[in-house]
């Protein structure tokens, strides 16, 4: 079933390429590009709580680096760390290894060595949007995620994965691209 969907997607893209390619190039040229959040790439949530801190790593693309917010405390990593501190009753030290626009394959080569420099208890891998827009094959995407997860687990981390957001609802994309990328994601 999965292979059928992949073939259908590529056939649909081929048929719609005369419309989709100019639209994609125009969107890439004119889309609003927001900077990553400012501030330190590490922090502490629940520092007043007792006990040894839980060490959290968020590794990934634009969501990981807080694109769209001013401070990382307001981004995914800061909110996740605060929630973990509240639920666990212990402090959470957090850090981010990420890059706006990076794919999982690129991150495995460029960001994973940096991510492994310090001990981690819990790692969240945040990938999928850029892999969808860069047309990374499902096999290469899964292989890169598995490689990063295996390396992090070998260093003692528990690993979690975020889901790929519903690209079909991204209002910044024209209708045709939303449909194609949403189907692919």
Model-found features: residue ranges?
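N-terminal secretory targeting modules
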Residues: 1-57, 70, 88
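Charge-dense, low-complexity intrinsically disordered segments
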Residues: 5, 12, 67, 135, ...
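Internal, well-ordered alpha-helical segments in soluble enzyme and binding-protein domains
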Residues: 21-26, 76, 144, 148, ...
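Residue-level detector of flexible, active-site-proximal loop/helix-junction positions
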Residues: 25, 29, 101-103, 166
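Generic structural signal for beta-strand residues in well-ordered domains
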Residues: 48-49, 87, 116, 152
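Conserved SGNH/GDSL esterase-like catalytic core that processes O-acyl groups on lipids
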Residues: 55-57, 63-143
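Alpha-helical cap/lid subdomain in secreted, periplasmic
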Residues: 110-185
